[in-house]
Amino acid sequence: MFEGVDKKIYSSVSVDDVKESKKAVDCLCEYGHEKIVMLAAQPWDESISGLRVQGYKKALEERQIPINENLIRYTFQEETAFTMENGYKLMKELLESDEEFTAVYAISDSMAIGASKAILESGKKIPEDYSVMGFDGLDIAYYYNPSISTIRQPVEDMAKETSKILFDLIENNADNRHKIFDGELVVRQSVVRLNK
């Protein structure tokens, strides 16, 4: 969902970013992880990144896991927040700190892949040392080694719905519509159950 969008003026097609982000973090928690890093966009972002951070916090709060704000890492890049480069940089910074964690959740598969590269370069292993979860369902996440767990967005269905709404608005002067799709949790090689 898009916060701040006037639903009377605009149409929208999206996933519920809070709900789907919570689903990703719930999965990590169910695998025994409590010290979970969140790689996000700018701290002032109230749209996609901000909503996914809300889902992260909600999952931890519901399980009464304390939120360590030092494990929420933000990029300050304005236009290219969701990139592999930013995931890589944020993870390198974190690995050089004293913060302890067992899992990484990135707001995009691209950031998850960048973070994974930094983890592997540090001599650590995925998932033996750190589990990694992304968001989007990009093909590259499947082909990366180890394959990245993710929340897959139904991109084709969302594109079809967007076209349908657009043509209906143009041809029939229809009212604005808002469609929310469910994402799919896809657990792959990058997430492992934590042995306590």
Regions found by a protein language model. Name each.
Residues 1:
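Mobile cap/lid helix-loop segments that gate and shape the active-site cleft of serine hydrolases
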Residues 4-196:
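Bacterial carbohydrate/catabolite-sensing allosteric modules
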